Amino acid sequence: MKLVNSLIAAAFVFSMATAQAGVIIGGTRIIYHADTKESSLDVKNPDPYSYLIQSWVDKDENDTSKTPFIVTPPLFRLAGNEENKLRIINTGGNLPQDRESLFWMNIKTIPATGKLDNVNTLQIAIKTRIKLIYRPASLTEMPEKFASKLSWKRSDQQLTVSNPTPYYMNFSEVKVGASTVTDATYVAPMSSATFSLPANAKGNIRWKIISDF
């Protein structure tokens, strides 16, 4: 599984040496099954120095309202060459029971020190966002089983996909002929999504769904 990090903050530059965030997140998304008490996510620090790990769940990057999930521990120090487990707990709430719901798990890693071997360094905080999908107990099948139910429509330089299923369909790849539709990420349950087509894209539409495993 690949880890995609987004750079969110940088401190003072003292030399060319840089402390790179090396914390490994043990997953690219989380499926939270409604009939379980909690889900978990491993974090590992392969570096010899420590990081502060801050974690939380939100609905959207621009929506900081309270969600029905808490992460424990929310803030802790992860020593060098150690690992820990983040636990995600559903605190209750009126979530839909006929379809999946999408939240985002945020993990911010902050170097706990600005020095390595007495060399001043640039401290960088890294935030990783991965999908947290709440799956009601009534949904017992795998999403990929219903991938054939997706319907696609092309209009000018746009491609629209309709999803009549109760599952989030996450795309690993969408292609029109030999052209890759780079902004095709996912489509929500009982909904549709529209993506921009590459210039001169021609041919059949092909797609791949990311499975739970």
Spell out what each predicted region is.
Residues 93-145, 202-213:
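Terminal connector regions
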Residues 24, 42-88:
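Surface-exposed binding patches on compact interaction domains or structured appendages
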Residues 1-8:
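Bacterial N-terminal signal peptides that target proteins for export
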Residues 16-18:
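N-terminal signal peptide c-region/cleavage motif recognized by signal peptidases
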Residues 66-95, 178-204:
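Intrinsically disordered, low-complexity Pro/Gly/Ser/Thr-rich segments with frequent PxxP/GP/PP motifs
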Residues 43-47, 159-165:
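Asparagine-centered strand-capping/turn motif at beta-strand->loop junctions
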Residues 21-42, 142-151, 184-186:
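Beta-sheet-dominated interaction scaffolds and their linkers
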